Amino acid sequence: SVDFNSESTRREEKQKEIVDLHNXLRDXVX
């Protein structure tokens, strides 16, 4: 249970990082 929870949080954090990165690229192109 803890492992699954930890993995889920990690995945969410990574996704957030990717979204931030995409937003930054968009601003640059933008």
UniProtKB/Swiss-Prot annotation:
Q: Which GO terms describe its molecular function?
A: calcium channel regulator activity; potassium channel regulator activity; toxin activity
Tissue pattern of expression reads: Expressed by the venom gland.
Q: Does the keyword Nuclease apply?
A: no
Q: Which cysteines are joined by disulfide bonds?
A: none
PTM notes = Contains 8 disulfide bonds.
Keywords of the record, alphabetical order, are: Calcium channel impairing toxin, Calcium-activated potassium channel impairing toxin, Disulfide bond, Ion channel impairing toxin, Potassium channel impairing toxin, Ryanodine-sensitive calcium-release channel impairing toxin, Secreted, Toxin, Voltage-gated potassium channel impairing toxin
- Show the GO cellular component annotation of the record: extracellular region
Keyword Disulfide bond in record: yes
Q: What is its main location?
A: secreted
Q: Where in the cell is it found?
A: Secreted
Function text: Inhibits calcium-activated potassium channels (KCa), voltage-gated potassium channel (Kv), and the calcium release channel/ryanodine receptor (RyR).
Q: Which family does it belong to?
A: Belongs to the CRISP family.
**Protein's UniProt name:** Cysteine-rich venom protein hematin
Species of origin reads: Hemachatus haemachatus (Rinkhals)
